[in-house]
Design a protein with these regions (language model features):
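Substrate-binding clefts and catalytic carboxylate motifs of secreted carbohydrate-active enzymes
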Residues: 2-172
């Protein structure tokens, strides 16, 4: 009721006729989302396995897949892509058990998400969060900033950068 006239105005004013995009956040899901049908493209931001189910990538992947399937069932003709997904990683921190914050966990996290994407033919794209670590406001939750980058702040690659290079080179 609020968004549809607004979206229609945007479409009318956009001379380039670009797709109208909905970018969701963690609180929006296939049941609660109020605007999925009126946009042209769904972009889903999710951090299953990081902000919830941390350390449980099998459970995180199942939740992610269920959610993506729910959006597809609701909007079967809409392209869906992942706009944000990632896990904080301390560069140089390694753990044989791939615990959270380790470079191994970040790679396993990205691999788990990639397996979900690859199993769903209607997923049209993926955009990992983030290219490089970056500064954030000082607080006790993020020591030294957001560390979800696949490169450090000085642009040194983490293990994840090598993993993504291999993954994306293999996509046809």
């Amino acid at each position: 009721e609020y968004f549809e006239p607004l979206l229609n105005l945007v479409r009318e004013l956009d001379e380039q006729k670009r797709p109208a995009t909905l970018v969701t956040y963690e609180g929006s899901n296939p049941v609660s989302c109020k605007v999925a049908e009126i946009c042209d493209l769904l972009i889903i931001n999710r951090y299953r396995g990081w902000y919830d189910t941390e350390g449980n990538l099998r459970g995180a992947a199942a939740l992610l897949k269920d959610e993506l399937e729910g959006f597809h069932k609701r909007c079967p003709d809409k392209p869906i892509m992942l706009g944000e997904y990632g896990a904080d990683t301390i560069a140089g921190f390694h753990d044989i058990n791939a615990r959270i914050f380790s470079e191994e966990y970040q790679v396993d996290f990205l691999r788990a998400y990639g397996e979900v994407f690859d199993s769903l033919p209607y997923i049209t794209g993926e955009h990992v969060w983030n290219f490089a670590d970056f500064a954030t406001a000082e607080n006790i939750k993020r020591v030294g900033g957001n560390k979800k980058g696949v490169f450090t702040r000085d642009r040194s690659p983490k293990m994840a950068a090598h993993f993504l290079k291999e993954r994306w080179e293999g996509i046809s």
